[in-house]
Amino acid sequence: MLRGNNIKKVNSLLVRSFHSTVGNRSGGPSTPINYPSLEIENAGEKQKMNLFQAINNGMDIAMQKDSKAVVFGEDVGFGGVFRCTVGLRDKYGASRVFNTPLCEQGIAGFAIGLAAQGATPIAEIQFADYIFPAFDQIVNEAAKYRYRSGGQFDCGSLTIRSPYGAVGHGGHYHSQSPESYFGHTPGLKVVIPSTPIEAKGLLLASIREKDPVIFFEPKLMYRSAVEEVPIGDYEIPLGKARIVKEGKDITIIGWGAQMRVLLQAVNMAEEKLGISCELIDLRTIQPWDVETVVESVKKTGRVVISHEAPKTGGWAAEISATIQERCFLHLEAPIQRVCGYDTPFPLIFEKFYVPDHLKNFESIKKTMVY
């Protein structure tokens, strides 16, 4: 197992690879996608930010407003491998922004203890692939703390941030999408933003949420997603999906970095085939917005759900089951899932593994002609 200086060298190489390929999973030229920005009411002054800067700004505001908020994790003191915590230690001091040992189980356990004692811990797991050593602490301790104490104690102020998903040359251990593991756990909330505006608003809502939250950040979007972000304090409600694009022929559902892939597929379907697609960004995986999805599917009668995680047991299966229960008589075609393969995440074959816009476009065509 890599530890200490060796793992720092590996992470440094991965980050440099990430910078060279960001915006295009195959490493080829990036095609800009005009992704619709979310409008925030009474937004006030705005500033151009990419996704990691919006997350940094969100944590900054949380720490300004809450003197009990602390940020910690591997290498967060110097800004983290993706720079999400840059400048926070200088501003708030080493007692509130600090490094931890390379021990994810310890990070999670320490965060649970802090939350139980009234602090507001914002813990970082450096890559979502390494959240598994902390799995027991998260699902058996954090998620059940309030329940098993009969409501006497809780660690609801806990937020665990972690970058997830494909990025280009990440390989087996820096590319995974583990959201469905945690979506299966009562007592946790699971949030995945797709834009800078949403990242900041959802993160602030997560930090102030009364249940523990796992906040997965699409590392592909850290620098490639750029918007005019309100610099003030605002929240986006958890558990509420966003209809990115309205349509009448087919419902397309995704989250995180997959949203830009889906928008590209939707645009292709409309330009080449005249298909009107309704595109939904779940934003919160647990609890997910059942009513928004059901209302859309009853209108369109056709559904494609896409995520990077393997198909079997992925969150698309849970959504599909609910749609089948709630919308059976409205369906005009079988529900389609466009997902990663049921294999470990490959290195050189990443381009073929990920559910790109072409795979989603073909699935839309297949569903429409059924």
Curated annotation (Swiss-Prot):
GO terms for molecular function: 3-methyl-2-oxobutanoate dehydrogenase (2-methylpropanoyl-transferring) activity; metal ion binding. Its cofactor is thiamine diphosphate. Residues 1-25 form a transit peptide. Its main location: mitochondrion. K(+) binds at G156, L158, T159, E209. Thiamine diphosphate binds at Y130. It is an enzyme of class 1 (oxidoreductase). It catalyses: N(6)-[(R)-lipoyl]-L-lysyl-[protein] + 3-methyl-2-oxobutanoate + H(+) = N(6)-[(R)-S(8)-2-methylpropanoyldihydrolipoyl]-L-lysyl-[protein] + CO2. GO terms for biological process: branched-chain amino acid catabolic process; response to nutrient. It is found in: Mitochondrion matrix. Its EC number is 1.2.4.4. It holds the Pfam family Transket_pyr. Signal peptide: none annotated. GO terms for cellular component: branched-chain alpha-ketoacid dehydrogenase complex; mitochondrial matrix. Keywords: Metal-binding, Mitochondrion, Oxidoreductase, Potassium, Transit peptide. The keyword Oxidoreductase applies. Heterotetramer of 2 alpha and 2 beta chains. The branched-chain alpha-keto dehydrogenase complex catalyzes the overall conversion of alpha-keto acids to acyl-CoA and CO(2). It contains multiple copies of three enzymatic components: branched-chain alpha-keto acid decarboxylase (E1), lipoamide acyltransferase (E2) and lipoamide dehydrogenase (E3). This is 2-oxoisovalerate dehydrogenase subunit beta, mitochondrial. It comes from Dictyostelium discoideum. The lineage of its organism: Eukaryota, Amoebozoa, Evosea, Eumycetozoa, Dictyostelia.
